[in-house]
Structures are given as C-alpha cells and as structure tokens.
Design a protein with these regions (language model features):
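Short, glycine/serine-rich, charged loops/turns that create anion-binding
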Residues: 46, 75, 172
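FAD-site-proximal beta/loop scaffold in flavoenzymes
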Residues: 10-35, 120-187
Length: 187
C-alpha cells in the first residue's frame, strides 16, 4: 500500500485510531460548514468503503449537504469476490458517492488532494484509510513481530515468545503466512 505525502493538513483524518473519526464527526456536526461539504475518502479497501458509507449516513441523518468522493486506488475492494465488489459499487453509487478507480492520491495539501492522474480534488474534510498496519506497540514493547510489525503468533494465535499472550485480527503476523489487512483492529 502506498503512503501519501501529507503537508500540515489538520482537516485530514487518518481512520486510526478511532478517536480521529470521533473528532471528525464532531467537526462535521458542530460547524455550519460549506454547502455542500466536500468529503474525500482515500483508500478503496473495506475501511475506506465503510467510512464513505458511514459519512453518507451521518450527513443524511443530520441533514448536511455533502459531496462524497472515494479514491479507491486500482479498484474498489480489490481483494473481494467480484459479486461483493459489484454490490458495494452499486450501493455507493446509488447514494451519489463518487468512486474513483485506477488512481491514488499523490499529495495532500490543505484543501486539495492531487491525484496520480493530475486531477485535483478540493476537500473540506478528508479521511485516510490507506496502508493499514499494526500498531507499533508490539515492537516498542520488545515482543516478537513479523515483517509488517504485527505480533508474531503461531497457529493457535499465541505469541511465539510469551505463551500467555494471544493476538488476533489486523494486529498479528501469523508465522509462515501472509495475512490480508482488512481494516479491523483487534487485540
């Protein structure tokens, strides 16, 4: 997954930790804001797809005019079965959420996102759901980690060095296997 250069952008919220989304929600609901709010979600995996849909629901329930764009990378839910992908695209598009495929953000600056294609997306709030990675907690605490920084566990989800510690979800590295990161953080 690609990292995006972000330049001092207080209106860009990484989706993790969850507190970032709470702050973004408070901003969206507290301020009169533009009409419509221009909301951009970066990342076409499960987390980005869920964020885009939840933004739509939040704004719809609060009566907030919105223009939501999801920058999906190569394609929305690339690792999902074709039927799941088609249903997700249909659901998002039926809510007038713009899904941009075959492009990524190259650079993010205050108020604008420059895509690889050269297109510029203006935004009022943006959400980054790219590059799902385990927390650095495991490396910082001296626990064994896999190549991606996840807690190294065996087939029973026990830490390889401390049998009393178990891990699961996107925070682990299963010894001998590469796991897809799907945006769920469980410890």
């Amino acid at each position: 997954r690609d990292e995006v250069a972000v330049r001092n952008c207080p209106r860009v919220y990484p989706v993790k930790p969850i507190e970032n989304l709470v702050r973004a929600r408070q901003t969206l609901l507290a301020e009169p804001g533009p009409s419509p709010w221009r909301l951009v979600v970066l990342g076409g995996g499960p987390a980005g797809t869920e964020i885009a849909a939840n933004l739509w629901r939040l704004c719809a329930e609060a009566g907030i005019p919105r223009d939501i764009t999801l920058v999906a990378g190569e394609r929305l839910l690339a690792g999902a079965p074709p039927r799941v992908r088609a249903l997700a695209l249909e659901s998002l598009r039926s809510r007038n959420i713009h899904v941009l495929e075959a492009t990524r953000a190259r650079r993010i600056e205050p108020g604008e996102i420059v895509l690889e294609t050269g297109r510029i997306l203006d935004y009022d709030l943006a959400f980054s759901a790219v590059g799902v990675r385990p927390s650095p907690l495991f490396e910082e605490s001296g626990l064994p980690t896999g190549p991606d920084g996840g807690l190294l566990v065996d087939s029973t989800l026990r830490c390889t060095a401390h049998r009393e510690i178990f891990g699961g979800g996107d925070c682990i590295s299963l010894r001998g296997t590469t796991l897809a990161r799907v945006g769920v953080m469980a410890v």
